[in-house]
Design a protein with these regions (language model features):
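Mature extracytoplasmic domains of secretory-pathway proteins
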Residues: 56, 60-115
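Sec-dependent signal peptide recognition
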Residues: 2-7
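Acidic/polar, low-complexity intrinsically disordered N-terminal segments immediately downstream
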Residues: 23-81
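Bacterial signal peptide processing site
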Residues: 18-21
Length: 154
């Protein structure tokens, strides 16, 4: 039980360090940036396999992989996701004992593809294990686009 609570606390710490900004629409060489919101206060269920696809389009599928990590305070509730109007892109990394953050950089649309760029920042070895997770929320209008992930390590 302590391990689960500690993993939830670490997930919240990681998501708190993630950018809270929403990307805006701009034109750049045939691509348009897509607005997204970072979902907070969710944890990956440890009895699940890492999803093969980063795209989750239904609440049922989302709830299969993620649980709510409600904490006290003003920003303690999980970010609301309306799957009738939105879908999510998730990045779930394997369990590690190295401090790891996943930071969304941008999402761009070009033709029928979404290019999701994110950074993975690794730090010091820890005495405990975490499972790094990042969830971003996008408008349903992009749901049918093919998703291509672009990872940057720092």
């Amino acid at each position: 039980m302590k391990k689960i609570l500690f993993a939830i606390a670490m997930l919240l710490t990681i998501t708190a360090c993630t950018s809270n900004s929403t990307e805006s629409d701009t034109n750049n060489k045939g691509t348009d940036e897509v607005a997204f919101e970072v979902a907070k206060n969710y944890f990956f269920k440890n009895d699940q396999q890492i999803p093969e696809s980063p795209k989750i389009t239904t609440e049922e599928e989302f709830n299969k992989f993620f649980g709510m990590a409600t904490v006290m305070g003003e920003d303690g509730k999980p970010t609301s996701i309306d799957f009738t109007k939105q879908f999510v892109l998730v990045i779930v990394l394997p369990v590690t004992d190295t401090a790891t953050e996943i930071n969304p950089v941008k999402v761009e649309v070009k033709s029928d593809s979404l290019f999701y760029t994110y950074e993975v920042k690794t730090g010091e070895k820890q005495t405990y294990s975490i499972q790094p997770v990042s969830i971003i929320i996008l408008d349903k209008q992009y749901e049918d686009n093919e998703v291509k992930l672009i990872s940057r390590r720092i």
